[in-house]
């Protein structure tokens, strides 16, 4: 069934993020800049990618007033904030001290662009925003990887190895940030186990033991985890 429409963007189409960017540049970006100059009493920042965005404030009062103003702004375009994805949290250099004084436990975390962001420190004790692979993203990507390995199960091992190596390099290129070494190693470990499982399933007479598989990896090593985005302040 097909029906023409002049509203919205094609779901899943490559042009949809571009159209969303153009629309939100006017509906959100420019408006936030104007609000910041006109109404903010402290520092604030906007970070946006497509329709995911993050607003940071120096002062809680600004955040509260922006929450009201933003809802009104989006309503003019027939939009509203996603209730499950919209939160106002205390985060930053003084969050841990403030929450400890109020007996509220550790600072909350937030997810943005595939990372879970949380308050941490550098090796010399300075505040630093730490990032780790978002748990849901990791689970989903590993599931997709296992499904693709199953589909490629009967390809030559050399072709499987080449494909998996490219997947790992792409993962490191995006998620290889300071403080996320554990997340990279975990992805590699699970990817290796998934590949071994796929090879074992295709062997009818002689299954691939771990000894044979480890010998295969020594002869054809997979790319090791590497950080692609390193900040000067080393994570603790």
Where are these regions (language model features)?
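Non-catalytic terminal/accessory segments
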Residues: 1-236
């Amino acid at each position: 069934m097909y029906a023409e429409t002049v509203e919205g963007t094609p779901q899943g189409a490559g042009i949809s993020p571009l159209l969303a960017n153009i629309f939100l540049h006017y509906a959100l970006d420019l408006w936030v800049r104007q609000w910041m100059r006109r109404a903010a009493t402290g520092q604030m920042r906007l970070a946006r990618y497509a329709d995911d965005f993050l607003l940071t404030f120096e002062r809680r009062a600004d955040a509260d007033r922006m929450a009201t103003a933003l809802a009104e702004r989006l309503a003019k375009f027939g939009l509203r904030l996603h209730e499950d994805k919209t939160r106002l949290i205390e985060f930053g250099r003084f969050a841990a001290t403030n929450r400890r004084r109020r007996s509220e436990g550790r600072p909350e975390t937030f997810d943005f662009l595939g990372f879970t962001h949380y308050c941490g420190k550098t090796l010399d004790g300075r505040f630093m925003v730490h990032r780790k692979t978002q748990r849901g993203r990791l689970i989903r990507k590993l599931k997709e990887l296992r499904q693709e390995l199953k589909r490629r199960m009967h390809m030559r091992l050399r072709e499987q190895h080449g494909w998996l190596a490219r997947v790992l390099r792409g993962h490191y290129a995006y998620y290889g940030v300071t403080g996320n070494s554990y997340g990279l190693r975990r992805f590699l470990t699970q990817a290796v186990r998934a590949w071994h499982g796929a090879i074992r399933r295709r062997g009818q007479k002689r299954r691939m033991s771990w000894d044979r598989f480890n010998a295969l990896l020594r002869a054809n090593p997979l790319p090791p985890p590497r950080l692609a985005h390193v900040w000067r302040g080393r994570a603790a």
